[in-house]
Amino acid sequence: MACVDEPPEKHCWVCFATEKEDRAAEWVSPCRCKGCTKWIHQSCLQRWLDEKQKGNSGGAVSCPQCGTEYRIVFPKMGPVVYFLQQVDRALSRASPFAAAGVVVGTVYWSAVTYGAVTVMQVVGHKKGLDVMERADPLFLLMGLPTIPVMLVLGKMIRWEDYVVRLWQRHSAKLQIFSGLVPGMGRALPRVPVEGSYGGDHLSVSRTLCGALIFPSIANLVGRLLFRRVTSNLQRTILGGIAFVVMKGVLKVYFKQQQYLIQANRHILNYPEPEGQADGATEDEDSSNE
């Protein structure tokens, strides 16, 4: 508002009502403003404060014109209300830490359960239970959660990429294998930019799922390929090694073929319309004559 001189009667700058229109209303001058923005209805200011505080009754609110912070007072509360208020504040402060503790505890006991199931799956159900019953409880509480952690860390070791880089570096020396692997030992027209042919970026969900499902896959491969092995532990270990080797060989071959595809990429000329192409050919012939 551009009003500078104080009007003869009070004027609310929220609802624009005057003192004559509502003589029973309570008026307040909460800031240093002068003129027509000096006065405001107590009820209008209360509603305006509710909108600005947005549920935070203890938040500070200032005048939008002069920037003076409003002095807000509350009636004195009794000891019971004060105690309940302190309890409510303490619970509000402690709830994030409690929630974090619940999440950490859930993850920890999930890891313990997964570790116990993995032990029974790898060693055998009866033998696994017997081993865990005879083991120290503290050792189980510390050792079982490390099983999924070690599986995830092992999954993050990308040894196939190292083999692919060695293959690409020494491919010229491996021409004797050109009959087994297409493109082995051939000269490449260009070297692709690293990362443009991988197509296998490190995915958190893929790494986590692959690591946690690995014991089940190792057990299944061991049962299929090494049925004559009587020990469940040895059969699972052999199945895991066989799966890692077969998967690694296929992955290395796939990445190398992607590398060759990118290296032999070729860009074609823009196809001209037939009429323009014939005209261009005639122009070239006439210029040659």
UniProtKB/Swiss-Prot annotation:
GO biological process, one term: regulation of mitochondrial fission
Binding residues for Zn(2+) 1: 12, 15, 41, 44
Zinc finger (RING-CH-type): 4-73
Keyword Transmembrane helix found: yes
Gene: marchf5
Any single Pfam family the record assigns to this protein: RINGv
Free-text comment on this protein's domains from its UniProt entry: The RING-CH-type zinc finger domain is required for E3 ligase activity.
InterPro entries reported in the protein's UniProt record: Znf_RING-CH, Znf_RING/FYVE/PHD
Catalysis: reaction(s): S-ubiquitinyl-[E2 ubiquitin-conjugating enzyme]-L-cysteine + [acceptor protein]-L-lysine = [E2 ubiquitin-conjugating enzyme]-L-cysteine + N(6)-ubiquitinyl-[acceptor protein]-L-lysine
Protein name: E3 ubiquitin-protein ligase MARCHF5
Superkingdom: Eukaryota
Gene Ontology molecular function terms on file: ubiquitin protein ligase activity; zinc ion binding
Catalytic activity, EC: 2.3.2.27
Main location per the UniProt record: mitochondrion
Any single GO CC term annotated in Swiss-Prot or TrEMBL for this entry: endoplasmic reticulum
Intracellular or extracellular location(s): Mitochondrion outer membrane; Endoplasmic reticulum membrane
Stated role: Mitochondrial E3 ubiquitin-protein ligase that plays a crucial role in the control of mitochondrial morphology by acting as a positive regulator of mitochondrial fission. May play a role in the prevention of cell senescence acting as a regulator of mitochondrial quality control.
Pathway: Protein modification; protein ubiquitination
